[in-house]
Amino acid sequence: MHIGQFQLTNRLIAAPMAGISDRPFRALCHAMGAGMTVSEMLSSNPEVWRSDKSRLRMVHSDEPGIRAVQIAGCDPDEMAAARRINADSGAQIIDINMGCPAKKVNRKMAGSALLQYPDLVKQILSTVVKAVDVPVTLKIRTGWAPEHRNCVEIAKLAEDCGIQALTIHGRTRACLFNGFAEYDSIRAVKQAVSIPIIANGDITDPHKARAVLDYTGADALMIGRAAQGRPWIFREIQHYLDTGELLAPLPLVEVKRLLIEHIRELHDFYGPGKGFRIARKHVSWYLQEHAPNDQFRRTFNAIEDASEQLEALKAYFENLA
């Protein structure tokens, strides 16, 4: 699959997830088989561009693979300026967020709130596409509410504005992450436009990935929550798509290696004062299968030193062996 001039190595994309898809996580997903990774959402508000938080979220020219960054906002000119700044920093693809269901984002008329205003969507997309010569993609939901699904209308509008690929999460904003993703709307969009369509939502294992591709006709899949604590899901899915066979479960020794490497990278990236806090949620996800009683996770979350975290993890896995 191509996005503009860029050819993905496969049809699997790591989703932009706020507070999760940082540089260490993106690098790990890339190493585990993602054909592309997308940065966590960056605000287009110029007042926060120079903050440490925004700086850490930006992609840079030395990152592996295709460098894609997601931006959010509602002001067309600010969005265009954010596109230019990120392109200058090394972004090769700009993704526009019109799918985030978070209240704090929607209150600012950003994310999925924009789906209620097709005229503003058109203005934003047209302005951003014209701002810099890098491909622009769009991520949406199926609509604002089940009774107001307008993803086909938005998709046609996006194609007319020059959007190079469209990701659709199979829920409306009102659904948040409740219930199940529905794929009829994604299928309808695929049949209505000619740009690449990326299906997103509840793609949790290789069998589901194959089924969603077959049913929707989507060109690619975007995987988010299922990769939390399980970044090797990309490798598992790709192997199944290629061969029709499932990989054996990842050996515990390999889980240990990946987890400790990931936590080390988080400590280095954020610094010892913040890295240990960021690490806690990732460790919880990794160990959901291996620490079902939560006792170790509760103990781990009380640790406030990076080196002690690493020692605790090593001891934990030694006890499991």
Curated annotation (Swiss-Prot):
<dbReference type="InterPro" id="IPR018517">
    <property type="entry name" value="tRNA_hU_synthase_CS"/>
</dbReference>
<dbReference type="InterPro" id="IPR032887">
    <property type="entry name" value="DusB"/>
</dbReference>
<feature type="binding site">
    <location>
        <position position="70"/>
    </location>
    <ligand>
        <name>FMN</name>
    </ligand>
</feature>
<dbReference type="GO" id="GO:0050660">
    <property type="term" value="F:flavin adenine dinucleotide binding"/>
</dbReference>
<feature type="active site" description="Proton donor">
    <location>
        <position position="100"/>
    </location>
</feature>
<dbReference type="GO" id="GO:0017150">
    <property type="term" value="F:tRNA dihydrouridine synthase activity"/>
</dbReference>
<dbReference type="InterPro" id="IPR004652">
    <property type="entry name" value="DusB-like"/>
</dbReference>
<keyword id="KW-0560">Oxidoreductase</keyword>
<keyword id="KW-0285">Flavoprotein</keyword>
<dbReference type="GO" id="GO:0000049">
    <property type="term" value="F:tRNA binding"/>
</dbReference>
<dbReference type="InterPro" id="IPR001269">
    <property type="entry name" value="DUS_fam"/>
</dbReference>
<dbReference type="InterPro" id="IPR035587">
    <property type="entry name" value="DUS-like_FMN-bd"/>
</dbReference>
<protein>
    <recommendedName>
        <fullName>tRNA-dihydrouridine synthase B</fullName>
        <ecNumber>1.3.1.-</ecNumber>
    </recommendedName>
</protein>
<feature type="binding site">
    <location>
        <position position="139"/>
    </location>
    <ligand>
        <name>FMN</name>
    </ligand>
</feature>
<feature type="binding site">
    <location>
        <begin position="224"/>
        <end position="225"/>
    </location>
    <ligand>
        <name>FMN</name>
    </ligand>
</feature>
<dbReference type="Pfam" id="PF01207">
    <property type="entry name" value="Dus"/>
</dbReference>
<feature type="binding site">
    <location>
        <begin position="200"/>
        <end position="202"/>
    </location>
    <ligand>
        <name>FMN</name>
    </ligand>
</feature>
<keyword id="KW-0819">tRNA processing</keyword>
<dbReference type="GO" id="GO:0010181">
    <property type="term" value="F:FMN binding"/>
</dbReference>
<dbReference type="InterPro" id="IPR024036">
    <property type="entry name" value="tRNA-dHydroUridine_Synthase_C"/>
</dbReference>
<feature type="binding site">
    <location>
        <begin position="16"/>
        <end position="18"/>
    </location>
    <ligand>
        <name>FMN</name>
    </ligand>
</feature>
<keyword id="KW-0820">tRNA-binding</keyword>
<keyword id="KW-0288">FMN</keyword>
<comment type="function">
    <text>Catalyzes the synthesis of 5,6-dihydrouridine (D), a modified base found in the D-loop of most tRNAs, via the reduction of the C5-C6 double bond in target uridines.</text>
</comment>
<keyword id="KW-0521">NADP</keyword>
<dbReference type="InterPro" id="IPR013785">
    <property type="entry name" value="Aldolase_TIM"/>
</dbReference>
<comment type="similarity">
    <text>Belongs to the Dus family. DusB subfamily.</text>
</comment>
<keyword id="KW-0694">RNA-binding</keyword>
